[in-house]
Amino acid sequence: MEILFFGVKMKVRIKVKGIVQGVGFRPFVYRIAKKNNLKGYVKNMGNYVEILIEGKKEDIRNFINDLKNKKPPLSRIDKLDIEEIKGIEEFDDFYIIKSENAKDEEEGTIPADVAICDDCLKEMLDKNDRRYRYPFIACTNCGPRFTIVEKLPYDRENTSMRDFPLCEKCLEEYKNPLDRRFHAQATCCPICGPKVFLSDGKEIIAEKDEAIRETVKLLEEGHILAIKGIGGTHLACKVGEDDVVLELRKRLGRPTQPFAVMSKIEYTELFAEFDEDEKNALLSLRRPIVVLKKSQDYDKYFSKYVSNLDTIGVMFPYSGLHYLLFDKEIAYVMTSANLPGLPMVKDNDEILKKLNGIADYFLLHNRRIVNRCDDSVVKKVADRLVFLRRSRGFAPEPVKVNINNNKNILCVGAELNSTACIVKRDKFYLTQYIGNTSKYETFCYLRDAINNILRLTNTNKIDAIVCDLHPQFNSTKLAEELSEKFGAEIFRVQHHFAHAYSLLGDNNYFDDAIILSLDGVGYGLDGNIWGGEVLLFKDGKMERVGHLEEQYQLGGDLATKYPLRMLLSILYKAIGEEAFDFIKRYNFFSEKELRLLKFQLEKKLNCPITTSTGRVLDAVSALLGICFEKTYDGEPSIRLEPVANRFKGDINIEPKIKNNILNTTELIYKSYEMLLNNENKEKIAHFAHIYIADGLFEIAKKISNKFGINTIGITGGVSYNKIITERIMNNAKREGFNFIYHQRVPNGDGGISFGQGVAYILKNGY
């Protein structure tokens, strides 16, 4: 509404939607109302904030300018409805009045958890402050939000902080509109707030600050500790001693997966390289793990067993407790406390039970974690930071898409690295990271996360439920169950199409495009395993127009775990029985196993067809002796990339393409020849990456020329690979194409639920 005032005084009602709860928005409104001599009130309506003001027209105009331009740093205004109403001089002052529950289906937005602010950090380190060394210090501008809230409106009684009644001094701050802790729901102090304690697994051995000091001592001595934080639990140990890190790997069952570490800016400069974008992410209030390039001095400070890649995942402290851990150590391993494939533990009893035998000691506290939330992870690829995992610090804040939609859509995601998503109007509410839903405990976590996001977005009615095409996914079965419960239609989206739609929605780009959808596995429209797809998006429809050569996945899922099987399968196609003689050099298969594998290949028994990019890269990794057994998702190809990075020369490549199909048998055969000719592994690894990148780009270019399309994009788990993605990007830009890539949602399966929502809307009219 354009405010054209007639008369000296007037009354205006303002409805503010967006991130306006738990971010100091009402105190801010109070202050600018008082500053501008206005009367009225501000009220939290559960899913929006209502403001009623009366006063002089110029004062109201100034108030609205302040509202738009001086809002709190954590807030976000998505919509501002302003209407003039009749009557004046109803109020004698300006008030913050009691919140109301949401009365309609309009969604509210719960802010994400944010790192401790500079003001709170300063107070916590001030010996004269009453919150000196108090690990749960928080205010309006920082601290837990999503992880403590049970329902809207975001008031203390609706959070786990209701277990801690405010003391007199905290209550005074909480009620003072001019105080930084006015209506800050996480407000507390050592007298009235949560308490930290240290356990040896049997009994409490230290409490309060003594527990923290003893934890630091135990870490320095080389012990492994479970540390309960804001959204879950970490396992921590020192980074510099091989035996300590190896012991954690042994106990946790993670033999090679790189560990993330927690450090501080002055220390990180010693062992890692980072640019301005990466530095800003590390220091941001959202505090994700940022994947950084190791520096030349890395080995001076870190055990080689922390990360066997050329990168290291680093996060900075994001709670008061984290800061208090740093004394002598420059960094700690800080990895999620979960067994492979299972959710991170969060409740004290569960922590003590499930981490028994893994952690030596347990630093716990008595504040309930309502919503589990893993650390977010970002990585710089193609000149931008992209999400490997979008969780703490970001979820459940919505992603806005410029798309017309009047339905409530529930999207249940894929199977691995999963999230779910609620779509309401133009807002896509992704859940926190869920994980591998083929595991029962994680499947239950998915169900709980869906119920929670429905509650927090005030969603009672679902019009459509979207799932993957794969009939055996647990998420597909859940979709069928929920479809019946809500009386909602069910809509299925092919996995790689969902990746492509995710890319389109992420970029608010809905014109024609060629999209490379590349990953390890996805159920194809033909019933085969896809993963190296060239997709045409034209006139609002998605179509597969090219792909990698079909290969046999020897032993089905066993070929994903043991990449030598994939190598043997492709080499057998290239050189016949000689492949079996060659594979013996790795001393991996027994003679009996080789006879069985030969029989399987000859008869095509349990040899599903795949076009997966991941499986081809896995085969190269095995060929070069880099990885023979996958112990975490994507390991063989992830470990191949740093080897390829070490090659600095140029390679002339002419990928073999026929009928828009990239010949990957040729890729493996050429790599095999190079190995026999004693070419170095770095060159062969680099060759494989460039062959795939250039080959797929050539197919995309040919199709774009045929249809007159000027946009090329890349998505899927393989698009985290810097060599492949940046090669395709540079090729596209050099040839004058518009290149699109992810920026707001994960490239991988964490973005599938988002893409499912976009797919449904576009299929039903845009």
Curated annotation (Swiss-Prot):
Acylphosphatase-like domain ranges (all copies): 11-98
Pfam families per record: Acylphosphatase, HypF_C, HypF_C_2, Sua5_yciO_yrdC, zf-HYPF
Pathway: Protein modification; [NiFe] hydrogenase maturation
GO molecular function: carboxyl- or carbamoyltransferase activity; double-stranded RNA binding; ligase activity; zinc ion binding
EC number(s) given by UniProt: 6.2.-.-
Domain of life: Archaea
Protein's job: Involved in the maturation of [NiFe] hydrogenases. Along with HypE, it catalyzes the synthesis of the CN ligands of the active site iron of [NiFe]-hydrogenases. HypF functions as a carbamoyl transferase using carbamoylphosphate as a substrate and transferring the carboxamido moiety in an ATP-dependent reaction to the thiolate of the C-terminal cysteine of HypE yielding a protein-S-carboxamide.
Single GO BP term: protein maturation
Name of the protein in its database record: Probable carbamoyltransferase HypF
Gene3D superfamilies registered for this protein in UniProt: 3.30.110.120, 3.30.420.360, 3.30.420.40, 3.90.870.50
Family recorded in the similarity comment: Belongs to the carbamoyltransferase HypF family.
Keywords (A to Z) from UniProt: Ligase, Metal-binding, Zinc, Zinc-finger
Sequence ranges assigned to domain YrdC-like in this UniProt record: 209-393
Disulfide bond entries: none
Catalytic activity: C-terminal L-cysteinyl-[HypE protein] + carbamoyl phosphate + ATP + H2O = C-terminal S-carboxamide-L-cysteinyl-[HypE protein] + AMP + phosphate + diphosphate + H(+)
